[in-house]
Amino acid sequence: MARDPSTTPGSPDGHDAGGGTGAAARVVQADDERADEYAAVLGSMAAVHPDDRALVEEWADARTGTVVDAGCGPGHWTAHLAGRGIEVIGLDPVARFVAIARAAAPQVDVRRATVESTGLPDAGVGGVLSWYSLVHHEPDAVPIALAEFRRVLVPGGGLLVGCFTGPVLEPFEHAVTTAYRWPVNRLAAVLEAAGFRVDAVHRRTDEGVRPHAALVARRS
């Protein structure tokens, strides 16, 4: 889900957009149980750090064609981008998040789908925003989502990935369920192996919150 990561360590700031069985299904269930809490605390643009807002806006404004908010959660980013005149589709596997997003912005296209199976056509979108929507994915599962992102993107289409970062790839206890910190160079290597070119990396560390990074990439 697209979210503001610059929150206190105990807040429910990570939402995974996977589905299916096993670990992914447990994440979806946990998110569904806390969807209203998340939406009330973090489900608005007022909760977004100004630096993150500027980065995502600049990236999205530069896309040609539809932008997919992959793991849109309560849909605040989806609605915000639509309000800027961008053609955007919000996707989330959590039924309650989809309902909240549709109620908040009925004019915006929000669909229930996972990041591994978006239901979108091949090479049909200009950008994919994955703003903290992979943070609960087990590392071996991340390439599956990236393959789906690459499939739906036009050649040269943009991908923006937000993540928790640290010196080593490691799990940590999160308010929803286990999440992962990624070294930037390691996640960049995974993106490149999945058929993306990483063009830029943005890092931000604020006192009292988890370090995070954003990787700007494009389908190669």
Language model region names:
Residues 156-163:
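Conserved beta-strand signature within the Rossmann-like core of class I S-adenosyl-L-methionine
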Residues 116-128:
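A short acidic, Gly/Pro-enriched loop at the edge of an enzyme's catalytic core
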Residues 68, 74-117:
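Class I SAM-dependent methyltransferase SAM/SAH-binding core
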Residues 206-220:
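Core SAM-dependent methyltransferase catalytic element
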Residues 170-186:
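Acceptor-substrate binding/catalytic loop of class I
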Residues 2-63, 167:
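Conserved class I S-adenosyl-L-methionine
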Residues 143-155:
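A short glycine-rich, Lys/Arg-flanked "PGG" loop and its adjoining helix->strand segment in the class I
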Residues 127-141:
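A short SAM/SAH-binding and catalytic strip from SAM-dependent methyltransferases
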